[in-house]
Amino acid sequence: MSEQVETRLTPRERLTRGLAYSAVGPVDVTRGLLELGVGLGLQSARSTAAGLRRRYREGRLAREVAAAQETLAQELTAAQDVVANLPQALQDARTQRRSKHHLWIFAGIAAAILAGGAVAFSIVRRSSRPEPSPRPPSVEVQPRS
């Protein structure tokens, strides 16, 4: 936080500064006008470019929307065909009843699965019980009295 100390200019320095600003003044005004003109030209060019980009994007977007609408119309037509043929497909499915042969096959598979489950259960249950050792215990077991 330094404190700025104002230094007073001597009359000679003030005169030099005033003459310098007076001599440069008209040049600055012209440069400002030129920059204003160039700036307006640049702004106009930017605005035109932005408008062209926007029109290009909107055109591309319109083409993409049209393609999406066409695809959607095709999908909707296909879905309508499927829905229109649905009653006939259901009728065909009803007429093709499963034969009793298939029923016996499914019953046999179910019985085999149940038998396999019973065998697996008995094996697991047997393995959870420890088998008694054929050897006598190494330590004499005496009841406490």
From Swiss-Prot:
The chain crosses the membrane at residues 104-124. It holds the Pfam family CwsA. It is a single-pass membrane protein. Keywords: Cell cycle, Cell division, Cell membrane, Cell shape, Membrane, Transmembrane, Transmembrane helix. It comes from the Bacteria. The keyword rRNA-binding does not apply. Required for regulated cell division, cell wall synthesis and the maintenance of cell shape. HAMAP family: CwsA. Interacts with CrgA and Wag31. This is Cell wall synthesis protein CwsA. It comes from Mycobacterium tuberculosis (strain ATCC 25618 / H37Rv). The gene is cwsA.
